[in-house]
């Protein structure tokens, strides 16, 4: 364990809570002390839901540890079963309760409750939230379907042709506190419907026990979020023979590849390659003259595995950006993230220390950061534009409007979210670059009269006095930037200005120069070939 100001993922019981809260008719009894009830806020504050998550806490206190905490667990399990009468009951423990080793799942299993009881054993000190969500969904689905597993899988993917109906697929993986999951589901449903494909079950988001029991009736499973659903899709394939798609439809190219894969698995005629050009505005802009400003922009990407990999492909193949950093906090997705980074000639950053991520970001000196809420803070400190592409997120990244990431409309949303910060960055740079032009000087004549001229002149005088005084006040050994050096530095775009300043100061120390003038800046640029 470590003490930190920020964590990308919570403990695994938060992942279990996400699954329980995403479904209906499912209740979660969590053996936990008073302090672990904070998780309710994640759903009411960030997701802005109108109801609390379906969780009952045992909320034991320090004085309870001297007594029989097992009886406390059984009492709360019975009360939850009687009060909520769920279709399925999840029983687990928080990271703190794990130390007591009361084994609440085993206690609940022996109580003879009328509903299915699913025991969750989530190692809090070695696993984290996404793994907890994946394991919970897997255990719940496996517990409900184990009685109907056939002796030998005999699934016919093209049974829909013989039965005279449209093909049917399940969408697996979307959950609460996922990044735009609700909107992605609606967009993918619409996308598949346009191609004559029905959606049978969406799980866990919005699903109930009866929906889980209907999962084997689908012709194909669509794994939308591998972090949550890949293990469940693999189990369904092994035991029922139902194949699953592995392409996540985020971006123009990935959406087309997704449709091709789904059509191939279902035995359907593949879609037209030009469909994306007809349904999304992103390709048109990418081929326009205006987009040449974006070509070669340096981008640093960090997030969960699914969104980081998708972002890297969009940046490198569809927008013409140069990816200078790629990483993820999700160790379960480390292998595919490393493979994606290798294709781009990079070494992936697999790390959950936000300070290490910020240091890597500063070292890469990007012009745009695509990351989580934490990268937004880090980028703000470094003066770099940023767009959030992944959880963890702030409430502002859970819009009330529809704002998907998947499908053709998702490509439009992504384009807006990623390109606009760069456009605003260009505007800010131009304003800064021409700040001292005669048309921008406060003392310039204007239709507003002469009220501001004298004051502006005084301000410039004050600034020049302050600038000239800095050289005398600078402590010995500290580098001094001359007025012409500072003026030249300000002409450099703000998103790379920090790197140029560091290079110039490093060069000045190397050659023993105490003052950095415009000439020193040019020499440093030539030295570093930047």
From Swiss-Prot:
Substrate binds at residues 425-426. Its EC number is 1.3.7.7. Pathway: Porphyrin-containing compound metabolism; chlorophyll biosynthesis (light-independent). The keyword Thylakoid does not apply. The active site is at 290 (proton donor). InterPro entries: ChlB/BchB/BchZ (IPR050152), LI-POR_suB-like_C (IPR013580), Nase/OxRdtase_comp1 (IPR000510), P-CP_red_C (IPR042298), Protochl_reductB (IPR005969), Protochlorophyllide_Rdtase (IPR016209). It holds the Pfam family Oxidored_nitro. Belongs to the ChlB/BchB/BchZ family. This is Light-independent protochlorophyllide reductase subunit B. The gene is chlB.
């Amino acid at each position: 364990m470590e003490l930190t100001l920020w964590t990308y993922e919570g403990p695994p019981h938060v992942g279990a809570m996400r699954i329980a809260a995403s479904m209906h008719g499912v209740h979660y009894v969590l053996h936990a002390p008073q302090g672990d009830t904070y998780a309710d806020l994640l759903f009411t504050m960030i997701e802005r839901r109108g109801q609390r998550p379906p969780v009952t806490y045992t909320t034991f206190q320090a004085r309870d540890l001297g007594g029989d905490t097992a009886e406390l667990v059984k009492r709360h399990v019975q009360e939850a079963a009687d009060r909520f009468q769920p279709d399925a009951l999840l029983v687990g423990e928080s990271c703190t309760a794990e130390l007591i080793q009361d084994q609440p799942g085993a206690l609940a299993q022996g109580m003879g409750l009328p509903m299915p009881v699913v025991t969750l054993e989530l190692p809090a000190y070695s696993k984290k939230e996404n793994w907890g969500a994946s394991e919970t969904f897997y255990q719940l689905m496996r517990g409900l379907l184990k009685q109907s597993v056939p002796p030998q899988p005999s699934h016919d993917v093209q049974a829909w042709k013989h039965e005279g109906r449209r093909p049917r697929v399940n969408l697996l993986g979307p959950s609460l506190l996922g990044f735009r999951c609700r909107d992605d589901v609606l967009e993918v449903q619409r996308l598949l419907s346009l191609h004559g494909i029905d959606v049978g079950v969406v799980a866990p988001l919005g699903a109930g026990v009866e929906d889980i029991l209907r999962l084997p009736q689908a012709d194909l499973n669509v794994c939308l979020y591998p972090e949550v659903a890949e293990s469940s899709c693999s189990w369904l394939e092994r035991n029922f023979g139902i194949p699953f798609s592995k392409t996540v439809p985020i971006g123009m190219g990935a959406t087309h590849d997704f449709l091709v894969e789904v059509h191939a698995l279902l035995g359907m005629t593949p879609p037209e390659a030009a469909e994306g050009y007809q349904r999304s505005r992103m390709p048109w802009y990418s081929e326009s003259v205006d987009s040449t400003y974006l070509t070669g922009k340096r981008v640093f990407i960090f997030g969960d595995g699914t969104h980081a990999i998708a972002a890297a492909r969009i940046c490198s193949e569809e927008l013409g950006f140069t990816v200078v950093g790629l990483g993820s906090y999700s160790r379960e997705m480390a292998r595919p993230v490393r493979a994606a980074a290798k294709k781009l000639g990079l070494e992936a950053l697999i790390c959950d220390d936000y300070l290490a991520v910020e240091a890597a970001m500063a070292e890469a000196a990007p012009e745009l950061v695509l990351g989580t809420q934490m990268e937004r803070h880090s980028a703000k400190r470094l003066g770099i534009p940023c767009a959030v592409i992944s959880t963890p997120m702030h409430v502002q990244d859970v819009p009330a409007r529809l704002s998907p990431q998947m499908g053709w409309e998702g490509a439009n949303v992504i384009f807006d979210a990623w390109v606009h910060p760069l456009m605003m960055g260009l505007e800010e740079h131009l304003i800064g670059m021409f700040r001292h032009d005669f048309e921008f000087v406060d003392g310039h004549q204007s239709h507003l009269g002469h009220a501001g001229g004298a004051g502006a002149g005084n301000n410039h005088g004050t600034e020049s006095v302050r600038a000239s005084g800095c050289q005398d006040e600078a402590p010995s050994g500290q580098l001094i930037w001359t007025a012409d050096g500072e003026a030249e530095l300000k002409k450099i775009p703000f998103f790379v200005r920090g790197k140029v300043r560091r290079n110039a100061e490093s060069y000045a120390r190397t050659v023993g120069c105490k003052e950095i003038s415009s000439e020193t800046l040019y020499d440093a640029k030539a030295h570093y070939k930047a």
